[in-house]
Amino acid sequence: MPFTLGQRWISDTESELGLGTVVAVDTRMITLLFPASGENRLYSRSDAPITRVMFNPGDTVTSHEGWQLKVDDVREEKGLLVYCGQRLDDETSAELREVFLDSKLTFNKPQDRLFAGQIDRMDRFALRYRARKHQNEQALQQWGGLRGMRASLIPHQLHIAHEVGQRHAPRVLLADEVGLGKTIEAGMIIHQQLLAGRASRVLIIVPETLQHQWLVEMLRRFNLLFSLFDDERYAEAKLDSSNPFETEQLVICSLGFVQRNAQRFAQLVNADWDLLVVDEAHHLVWSEESPSAEYQAVETLARATPAVLLLTATPEQLGQQSHFARLRLLDPNRFHDYQEFLAEQQQYRPVADAVTLLLAGEKAQTAELNALSDLLGEQDIEPLLKAINSDSDDNQKARQELIAMLMDRHGTSRVLFRNTRQGVKGFPQRILHQIRLPLPSQYQTAIKVSGIMNANKTLEVRARDMLYPEQIYQQLEGDDATWWNFDPRVEWLLNYLTANRDEKVLVICAQAATALQLEQVLRTREAIRAAVFHEGLSILERDRAAAYFASEEEGAQVLICSEIGSEGRNFQFASHLVMFDLPFNPDLLEQRIGRLDRIGQAKEIQILVPYLENTAQAMLVRWYHEGLDAFEHTCPTGRTIYDAHHAQLIERLTTVGEQQGLDEFIHTCRQQHDNLKQQLEQGRDRLLEMHSNGGEQAQLLAQAIAEQDNDVNLVTFALNLFDIVGINQEDRSDNLIILTPSDHMLVPDFPGLPQDGCTITFDRDQALSREDAQFISWEHPLIRNGLDLVLSGDTGSCAVSLLKNKALPVGTLLAELVYVVEAQAPKHLQLTRFLPPTPVRLLMDRKGTNLAAQVEFESFNRQLNAVNRHTSSKLVNAVQADVHAMLQQAEALVEAQARQLITEAQEQADLQLRRELERLEALKAVNPNIREDELTALESQREQVLSNLHEANWRLDAIRLVVVTHQ
């Protein structure tokens, strides 16, 4: 092509320079000026890697002055193009010579990029199409937010999260027993609400001691990066905003932190949260006469926030008044009068009795049948009542149907979820081993001296000190004291570990100093590999210690944890727990055992307690075991009995030598424990348990998600994505891959990839046992960000390939076109449930025939060969007129497919949302816990969804030209 001064060209290799202008031409060389970047380039005339920029009728171009022109015609004058058409600003006719085109011109449409020579690699085109397909398939999955968590697939947890997470502004009480995973349930609900766009701002309020546990759980299990607000962080944020809480979307803080300052609390309330989560909500004290300041603070926040999750102890442990107080936070209009609530609860007693009858499988007597009829009076249930007393195959089905009807009418089943260990099977047996050891003379002396020196300390402080004689000795003797040389617990631990080399052993002690000293002794005395876990370590350092312990190959045999350091970490792969000392209260004891005693623990848990005779430890072992049965079973009564006997317990811990009355004290505690436990068992609400654990549906949900684990398509796509993006991958032998950034990535910082890299696995079980490995799923930020990176930009939007096929004539031209059918709408409407961005692939020939149905993408892609960009540009220029014609023919074909997709989406949305609305309206007639605002929100959502689907459209997303060759 002849070159003329003023012509506009674009660089094939440096498209970021913008639009270039020919400023010098001689016999062998040309010079281009790129005004947008201020750069000059000198090219050889014979083979310059540049492409002439030529627009066509229908295109919109921008002048260097900023106004835009809709092109109607193009003519050439002395080698320069003149665009004729209508200005978009004042609708007047105008001409624009190419020399006056905006130099910052970018090409967004795939066909424009193709004709401008901005041609991408063919592997990127394939990646873009696969990304579109996978994005579409994942959007249609019904378990979004549940699949990507790094946690075992526990049916009752999945059921609660699925049930609550799908609601508009859920306000519920999660009251599972300890060890059943309330934190995970809350995390799954948060994750779903965020992914679905129902929430974007989340506030978690927890006790100060649990802040880091929540921070770790949300990050490690759900890849949610919360900001922990304390005084220091608040002061920093105050520099950036008048309301510091508006500087972050996801926030964790303690109630004490915000209560200390009235202005701070007001800012928190006014920060427009979408979802409020309150842990340990049973500590919020309430009475009708004088609610506590903490309760009132949470009440104020709950009223200002649409969605609320309260995590609390079980209702039976709380007592009815305390339970009512929690429900009142969720729905003050519904739960406004305590006496009315008590009367209503009595009315639900027959419902629970009826369910017990149906579950038992026995035939119903006349009185029982009448009771069922009364409870479900407005329904035609006569056939079902007959079926439950028959021997037909319909018996069980009828019972399940009646139970489902009763559940819909249950008083608080929509706002309260409560599972018990008895209702959820799969927990291991706990076996206690008490190891009685002699009290060394050094400790005897230290304890006596300490008693004299610390007489002015409070009784409680002295009692706590008595539990840790090694610390008493260390304080008296100084830093050079070597208590581990004579403490018989150390010798016992060494012998136990050397005798059980093949077992992973978790050792927990109260103090970080004790943990560090024990690790040193194990390493120097017996070369035992041990990791240490304490509050002085960063989260990353704790991850590494946990991973070292979890590793089967060359991993640590022992993990030594301090009390605080072990919070929020679970080690189900180990089954041996050594308590080097004992905690001060039963909640901490259960927390220690809970590190191993989780659903998914495959072995019996061996609890080993080496204790020194005639010490506070010895007395506490007896009280925990004989008084509370707290070692071998969970102890829901522990806190109640501890509070009731707190003063007496402290006194006995400080006067261990005086054994008088100890047996009676322990016997009294045991009687109280047995009585309370019996009351709790009698108060079990089996209907609520059924509703909370999800039954067979929950099992099917867990199975369905498990079947999607280790998805081969995910592994293939992810590795292909990492390759093309330019992320380094290093395979490890144990199903792990190390990812690190490279110098040639598509973007300087890949979202979700740390600067120092990360370790990933596609195996859920592997991720659970390796704290340092990230579990890759379709919901992981690396994959979601990767999809966004590819699809939100131009990556792979146009390509040119060669097809070596002697069955076709040389020069045969095919255009592979990928259109996207999509609807634009606010995220919270979740339009993607019905019409996610949907790729429609066409494979056009010159005759206007679509061959896509006969030629599958992957097999076709494998037959193609890449072409360099310069050659590609020449090919495109040669067939530009043909491509325009093919695009026009394709437009008519894609319209029919797109309109069909849109119509189907409208019908599905109307049917699904109408059914949902009708179901809630029917339930509201029999269950007052259906809130009016839920119905209003659903009706509004239905109208908006249908309106936005009506506006759905389609566009060309990617184009690949394929030219047949025989060479």
Swiss-Prot record:
<dbReference type="Pfam" id="PF18339">
    <property type="entry name" value="Tudor_1_RapA"/>
</dbReference>
<dbReference type="GO" id="GO:0003677">
    <property type="term" value="F:DNA binding"/>
</dbReference>
<dbReference type="InterPro" id="IPR022737">
    <property type="entry name" value="RapA_C"/>
</dbReference>
<dbReference type="Pfam" id="PF18337">
    <property type="entry name" value="Tudor_RapA"/>
</dbReference>
<keyword id="KW-0804">Transcription</keyword>
<keyword id="KW-0547">Nucleotide-binding</keyword>
<dbReference type="InterPro" id="IPR040766">
    <property type="entry name" value="Tudor_2_RapA"/>
</dbReference>
<feature type="domain" description="Helicase C-terminal">
    <location>
        <begin position="489"/>
        <end position="643"/>
    </location>
</feature>
<dbReference type="InterPro" id="IPR023949">
    <property type="entry name" value="Helicase_RapA"/>
</dbReference>
<comment type="subunit">
    <text>Interacts with the RNAP. Has a higher affinity for the core RNAP than for the holoenzyme. Its ATPase activity is stimulated by binding to RNAP.</text>
</comment>
<keyword id="KW-0378">Hydrolase</keyword>
<dbReference type="Pfam" id="PF00176">
    <property type="entry name" value="SNF2-rel_dom"/>
</dbReference>
<dbReference type="Pfam" id="PF12137">
    <property type="entry name" value="RapA_C"/>
</dbReference>
<dbReference type="InterPro" id="IPR027417">
    <property type="entry name" value="P-loop_NTPase"/>
</dbReference>
<comment type="similarity">
    <text>Belongs to the SNF2/RAD54 helicase family. RapA subfamily.</text>
</comment>
<feature type="domain" description="Helicase ATP-binding">
    <location>
        <begin position="163"/>
        <end position="333"/>
    </location>
</feature>
<feature type="binding site">
    <location>
        <begin position="176"/>
        <end position="183"/>
    </location>
    <ligand>
        <name>ATP</name>
    </ligand>
</feature>
<dbReference type="InterPro" id="IPR001650">
    <property type="entry name" value="Helicase_C-like"/>
</dbReference>
<dbReference type="InterPro" id="IPR040765">
    <property type="entry name" value="Tudor_1_RapA"/>
</dbReference>
<dbReference type="InterPro" id="IPR038718">
    <property type="entry name" value="SNF2-like_sf"/>
</dbReference>
<comment type="function">
    <text>Transcription regulator that activates transcription by stimulating RNA polymerase (RNAP) recycling in case of stress conditions such as supercoiled DNA or high salt concentrations. Probably acts by releasing the RNAP, when it is trapped or immobilized on tightly supercoiled DNA. Does not activate transcription on linear DNA. Probably not involved in DNA repair.</text>
</comment>
<keyword id="KW-0010">Activator</keyword>
<dbReference type="GO" id="GO:0004386">
    <property type="term" value="F:helicase activity"/>
</dbReference>
<dbReference type="InterPro" id="IPR000330">
    <property type="entry name" value="SNF2_N"/>
</dbReference>
<dbReference type="Pfam" id="PF00271">
    <property type="entry name" value="Helicase_C"/>
</dbReference>
<keyword id="KW-0238">DNA-binding</keyword>
<protein>
    <recommendedName>
        <fullName>RNA polymerase-associated protein RapA</fullName>
        <ecNumber>3.6.4.-</ecNumber>
    </recommendedName>
</protein>
<dbReference type="GO" id="GO:0005524">
    <property type="term" value="F:ATP binding"/>
</dbReference>
<keyword id="KW-0067">ATP-binding</keyword>
<dbReference type="InterPro" id="IPR014001">
    <property type="entry name" value="Helicase_ATP-bd"/>
</dbReference>
<feature type="short sequence motif" description="DEAH box">
    <location>
        <begin position="279"/>
        <end position="282"/>
    </location>
</feature>
<keyword id="KW-0347">Helicase</keyword>
<dbReference type="GO" id="GO:0006355">
    <property type="term" value="P:regulation of DNA-templated transcription"/>
</dbReference>
<keyword id="KW-0805">Transcription regulation</keyword>
<dbReference type="InterPro" id="IPR049730">
    <property type="entry name" value="SNF2/RAD54-like_C"/>
</dbReference>
<dbReference type="GO" id="GO:0016817">
    <property type="term" value="F:hydrolase activity, acting on acid anhydrides"/>
</dbReference>
